[in-house]
């Protein structure tokens, strides 16, 4: 673990000066910004006291508006009013048009197939639109805190891939923001409730927003959140509750005409108001389009019951993917404004067998968790005189066949962190695997530092490549590395703990990094050679087993050709010519193709023997 001091060159750190940091929940429907003041995390309102900022931007030739003012233009100027841009982040134009065919925007493709939205302000990509939302949030924070932000933590869905995460970072950079970290939304919600410092175990985060539903199953271990499974429904949210209730009110009021947009809007507004009122009251009076009537909570529950059930089915699937049962869940965190609906809380509580956490405003909980994390990462710790950022100074990885190092966690990764990678067996019938944990930047084991060794035993004796071993590296906030190896089919596992930074000076770390740069080209060539030698050994091992089992399938001449090709491969594999080894491997493959086909036919005949066509 390295401690990096971040400060302006030539200036001493001001020990009592708090750095300004914010947490940003960049949402699909609404966004928020929060900060920590006087030890308390709070979301920041606009001049009218509104904490939510609609994630909508309206573009004109002479500028743009963000938020409520932009949303008011949605009906009149649809093509220039961009909303739900988060759905487009990191996706190709073809992907967007397939997933969301009814978007009302004029799209064009960039040279690399990425989406560009044709607006009055010109062609804009989703990154630019997101940047304008982030700028509005940053301006609100800077005004409230009376200063420029030193850093932000931005939340993203747990299922966001690398392209979507990079797009979010690019948007922040375009907005002039320094991103301390991207934080998974469910993790942020758990942090807001202080679960990161509580008991270890499984946590479920149930997130029902306006347009989407997400369920995340997390495991907390030694201060690190690991995402076990995610799921949900991208076409289910609180908006669906509103539309069902609006249709019900329409029926009760006897309104048949659906073409009047003004009446449509009036019905929807009445439905939203009724939904909110029914969270606290058993009945509510509705006055809309000349009709007056009463709606009960029971009627509302009947309308939305099937939708709530759909969310619980998604929860069940996520739990199954995570390999846990509802009773294994330690806490359930509620996120999203639609979780205020009493029926939602009741059904979720029944499903998990425990009362969900609802003390923090579900609209604000993600932003609050992000603010808490930002306050820590920017260096606002008690009694701290400088900004300390904990990072892994040298890459951590494993030795693989051929004396190679497979990096699992690259250097400069902020901690705590957990990463997993799958490996497999090299030989037929292999029942044990030696795990050699390495540290360093070079490609070969001989040039890196050995941290620890342990063995995983009890692997089922399968053909080479048949067993799958998941190796998980986990570094906690104190820099303690835990490595766990688990065979997937049996669940058998072994683990070890080590302190990677123990015994290393800053000079030694710098020297190891310098060597990795100086010998980069040489190391790549050495790795390529080692990889080809490993592949040659695997091919020869597999061929030997096949010949032992089914040599009778070959004529003497065919056997001689295969033996000659194998002997040549064995000979060149002792040398250092990468191309020669590669060509020899290809030659063995060519000479054994017919043999492989005969073995396959024989296996099929054996499998079908004694069975009728109908049985097959």
UniProtKB/Swiss-Prot annotation:
CDD domains: ASKHA_NBD_HSP70_HscA. GO terms for biological process: chaperone cofactor-dependent protein refolding; iron-sulfur cluster assembly; protein refolding. GO terms for molecular function: ATP binding; ATP hydrolysis activity; ATP-dependent protein folding chaperone; heat shock protein binding; protein folding chaperone; unfolded protein binding. Keywords: ATP-binding, Chaperone, Nucleotide-binding. InterPro entries: ATPase_NBD, Heat_shock_70_CS, HscA_NBD, HSP70_C_sf, HSP70_peptide-bd_sf, Hsp_70_fam, ISC_FeS_clus_asmbl_HscA. GO terms for cellular component: cytosol. Belongs to the heat shock protein 70 family. Chaperone involved in the maturation of iron-sulfur cluster-containing proteins. Has a low intrinsic ATPase activity which is markedly stimulated by HscB. Involved in the maturation of IscU. PANTHER family: HEAT SHOCK PROTEIN 70KDA (PTHR19375). This is Chaperone protein HscA. It comes from Salmonella typhimurium (strain LT2 / SGSC1412 / ATCC 700720).
């Amino acid at each position: 673990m390295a401690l990096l001091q971040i400060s302006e060159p030539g200036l001493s750190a001001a020990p009592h000066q708090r750095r300004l940091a914010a947490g940003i929940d960049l949402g699909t429907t609404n966004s928020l910004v929060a900060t920590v003041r006087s030890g308390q995390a709070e979301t920041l309102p606009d001049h009218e006291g509104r904490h939510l900022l609609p994630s909508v931007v309206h573009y004109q030739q002479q500028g743009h508006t963000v938020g409520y003012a932009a949303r008011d233009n949605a009906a009149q100027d649809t093509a220039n009013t961009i909303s739900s841009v988060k759905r487009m982040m990191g996706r190709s134009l073809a992907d967007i048009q397939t997933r969301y065919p009814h978007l009302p925007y004029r799209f064009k493709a960039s040279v690399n197939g990425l989406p560009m939205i044709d607006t009055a302000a010109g062609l804009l990509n989703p990154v630019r639109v997101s940047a304008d939302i982030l700028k509005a949030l940053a301006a609100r924070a800077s005004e409230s805190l009376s200063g420029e932000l030193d850093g932000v933590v931005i939340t993203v869905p747990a299922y966001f891939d690398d392209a979507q995460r990079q797009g979010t970072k690019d948007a922040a950079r375009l907005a002039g923001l320094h991103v301390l970290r991207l934080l998974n939304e469910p993790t942020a919600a758990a942090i807001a409730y202080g679960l990161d410092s509580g008991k270890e175990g499984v946590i479920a985060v149930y997130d029902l927003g306006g347009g989407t539903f997400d369920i995340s199953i997390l495991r907390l271990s030694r201060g690190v959140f690991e995402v076990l499974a995610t799921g949900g429904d991208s076409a289910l949210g609180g908006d669906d509750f509103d539309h069902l209730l609006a249709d019900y009110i329409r029926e009760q009021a006897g309104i048949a005409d659906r073409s009047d947009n003004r009446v449509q809007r009036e019905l929807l507004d009445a439905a939203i108001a009724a939904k909110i009122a029914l969270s606290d009251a058993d009945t509510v009076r509705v006055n809309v389009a000349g009709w007056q009537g009463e709606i009960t909570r029971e009627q509302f529950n009947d309308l939305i019951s099937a939708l709530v059930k759909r969310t619980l089915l998604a929860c069940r699937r996520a739990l199954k993917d995570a390999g846990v049962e509802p009773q294994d869940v330690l806490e359930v965190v509620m996120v999203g404004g639609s979780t205020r609906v009493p029926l939602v809380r009741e059904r979720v509580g029944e499903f998990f067998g425990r009362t969900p956490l609802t003390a923090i405003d579900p609209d604000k909980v993600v932003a609050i968790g992000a603010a808490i994390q930002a306050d820590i990462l920017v260096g606002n710790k008690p009694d701290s005189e400088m900004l300390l950022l904990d990072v892994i100074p040298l890459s951590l990885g494993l030795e693989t066949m051929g004396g190679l190092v497979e990096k699992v966690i690259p250097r400069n990764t902020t901690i705590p962190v957990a990463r997993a990678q799958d490996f497999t067996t090299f030989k037929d019938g292999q029942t044990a695997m030696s795990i050699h944990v390495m540290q360093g930047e070079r490609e070969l084991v001989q040039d890196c530092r050995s941290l620890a060794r342990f063995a995983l035993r009890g692997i089922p004796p399968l053909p080479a490549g048949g067993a799958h071993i998941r190796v998980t590296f986990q570094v906690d906030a104190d820099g303690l590395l835990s490595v766990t190896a688990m065979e997937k089919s049996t669940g058998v596992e072994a683990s070890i703990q080590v302190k990677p930074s123990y015994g290393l000076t800053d000079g030694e770390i710098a020297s190891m990094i310098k060597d990795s740069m100086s010998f980069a080209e040489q190391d790549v060539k050495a790795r390529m050679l080692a990889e080809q030698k490993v592949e040659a050994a695997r091919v020869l091992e597999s061929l030997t087993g096949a010949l032992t089992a089914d040599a009778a399938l070959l004529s003497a001449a065919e056997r001689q050709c295969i033996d000659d090709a194998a002997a040549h491969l064995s000979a060149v594999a002792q040398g250092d010519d990468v191309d020669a080894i590669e060509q020899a491997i290809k030659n063995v493959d060519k000479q054994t193709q017919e043999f492989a086909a005969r073995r396959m036919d024989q296996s099929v005949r054996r499998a079908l023997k004694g069975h009728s066509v109908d049985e097959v």
